[in-house]
Each structure stands twice: as structure tokens, then as C-alpha cells.
Amino acid sequence: MRLHDVKPQKGSKKRKKRVARGISAGQGASAGLGMRGQKSRSGSGTRPGFEGGQQPLYRRLPKLKGFPIVNQKIYTTINVEKLASLPANTEVTLASLKAAGILTAVKGPLKILGNGELSTPLKVQAAAFTGTARSKIEAAGGSCEVL
């Protein structure tokens, strides 16, 4: 194959339809716009979101209330039940959880949540604990250290 053999792909060089050029041209008279109505007039078209005079969706829905949280803390969260698979007396940190494959994506500092049961004692180091998570870890014989 040489450069002069290269041809455009079939269907890629489609000609534009020439409308309103006489009846015999195929798209004459109304130029494919139908008989009458707003959409057949010149400069036609309504603005985006216009619903024909009906109250549009963006006006029917209430406005959002409140303010955005400015310096929001985004934590990497994990439940106590995920820590149950670790061996006893393990030091649990963000790095160790990632190495063990329990965490995949790290969004920020580690926060331990209290969903599930824990029976093995663990030494957990995290940026934050919920009250139930702290009580479950300490009830299992482990310790909680806030970084």
C-alpha cells in the first residue's frame, strides 16, 4: 500500500443535504420542516428548557438551601467489621490497611466507623474514631490512638 492508494473510509465523506432549492431537488418547498408552526419559521427554535408555556422543570424544583462547607475534612472511612480479618495484636494504620488490600483508594486521613463486630484485639492508629468504633475496639482488648 502506498500513499496514493489511501482512500477515505466509506461513509466518512457524506455530502450535506441541500434543502430549499426547488421541488425537484427532493427537499424543496418546506425544506423538511413540515407545514406550519414555530419550528418551521425562520430563526426558529425555542430556548433550552422551554416547555411550551408550561412551568419548566428548573422553576418547579426548589432552590438549594444553605452554604457549601468551606474546609470540609474528607476521611478515608472503614468499618470495624473489615478489621476483623486481621490477625490479633496487629498495628492498624492507613499504610498497613492498603498493604493488606483492605483499602484500595485513599481519599484522606483514616476514620474508623463502628458497623459490625470485632473479636480480635488490635492496636488501631487513625485520625478519628466514632464512639461505637472506639468502644468495640477496646471491648475486644485493643487500643485506639488518635494521630
From Swiss-Prot:
KW Zinc (keyword) present: no
GO CC annotation terms, alphabetical: cytosolic large ribosomal subunit
Compositionally skewed regions (Basic residues) per UniProt: 10-20
InterPro entries: Ribosomal_uL15, Ribosomal_uL15/eL18, Ribosomal_uL15/eL18_sf, Ribosomal_uL15_bac-type, Ribosomal_uL15_CS
Chain positions covered by the region annotation Disordered: 1-57
Transmembrane spans: none
A GO term, aspect molecular function: structural constituent of ribosome
Pfam families xref list: Ribosomal_L27A
Biological process terms in GO annotation: translation
Keywords: Ribonucleoprotein, Ribosomal protein, RNA-binding, rRNA-binding
Description of how the protein assembles with itself and partners: Part of the 50S ribosomal subunit.
Family named by the database record: Belongs to the universal ribosomal protein uL15 family.
Function: Binds to the 23S rRNA.
Protein name, per record: Large ribosomal subunit protein uL15
Native organism: Nostoc punctiforme (strain ATCC 29133 / PCC 73102)
Lineage of the organism: Bacteria, Bacillati, Cyanobacteriota, Cyanophyceae, Nostocales
Encoding gene, per UniProt annotation: rplO
